[in-house]
Design a protein with these regions (language model features):
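Active-site loop-to-helix "anion-binding N-cap" substructures in soluble metabolic enzymes
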Residues: 1-260
């Protein structure tokens, strides 16, 4: 069984000092370390160092980033490279989030280069894909997911493809309080795994963790993880409060430990 992955995407929230306090409190509230789940927090760039220090050398929580640039160095004002992130202790990086695509015009070819750069420097890329409400309503969800996967992953080396985690985030469910139904999420995850098998191989597709992201809360995490097609969650708003994120982690650990 694939290990559940829970990723807390803080977005543009928490100063460095606030982040350190938050992480110390979170560590105290988490369930005992488990082989059934893996936890990642992705603070803003400015808080990565303080979070790394607060986590300590043997923390069960891993450090992630919210973006990177595809070149190692250069005249790219405001950007951060993969070597900079690995030097700070990051293990994961979120790429292609819908907010990056919509607000900043991030294109698929850029995301493709970022995935390659991340893997080349030992980071595990989390590729975000998902449809808008209009695309779901007109019945093109599968087409959109297929195209985003092909644009992001086609042509990458086998070892890079094997390192990728995919996060399905229906755009209409992000920050809206609306969540896809379990049936909707499972159908999308099955499409993603089928396309991954075609792009990479059936074995890579079977081993790839596919997360759900879109108004994940302590109240719906159990029902989401009841399906073996859903391998974890990319958590937004609910990860900004210690109690809610710790509860999500606890429920996830119990759910998968008892094989629900």
């Amino acid at each position: 069984m694939r290990t559940v992955l829970l990723v807390g995407n803080w977005k543009m929230n928490k100063t460095a000092s606030e982040a350190a306090v938050f992480v110390r409190e979170l560590k105290e509230r988490l369930p005992a370390p488990s082989t059934t789940i893996e936890l990642v927090v992705a603070p803003p760039f400015t808080a990565l160092e303080s979070v790394r220090i607060a986590l300590g050398p043997s923390s069960p929580i891993q450090l992630g980033a919210q973006n990177l640039f595809w070149d190692d160095r250069g005249a790219y004002t405001g950007e951060v490279s993969a070597p900079m992130l690995t030097d700070l202790g990051c293990r994961y990086v979120i790429l292609g989030h819908s907010e990056r695509r919509i607000l900043f015009g991030e294109q698929s070819d850029h995301i493709h280069k970022k995935i390659r750069a991340a893997h080349n420097h030992g980071l595990r890329p989390i590729l975000c894909i998902g449809e808008t409400l209009a695309e779901r309503d007109n019945g093109t969800t599968d087409h959109v997911l297929t195209q985003q996967l092909r644009d992001g992953l086609s042509g990458l080396a086998t070892e890079t493809l094997a390192a990728v985690t995919v996060a399905y985030e229906p755009v209409w469910a992000i920050g809206t309080g609306k969540s896809a139904t379990v049936d909707q999420a499972v159908a999308a995850h099955r499409t993603i795994r089928r396309v991954l098998a075609a792009i990479a191989s059936p074995s890579i597709a079977d081993g790839t963790r596919i997360l759900y992201g879109g108004s994940v809360t302590p109240h719906n995490i159990e029902s989401l993880l009841a399906s073996d097609q859903i391998d974890g969650a990319l958590v937004g708003g609910a990860c900004l409060q210690v109690e809610s994120f710790a509860t999500i982690a606890t429920v996830a650990s119990v759910t998968r430990s008892i094989g629900v």
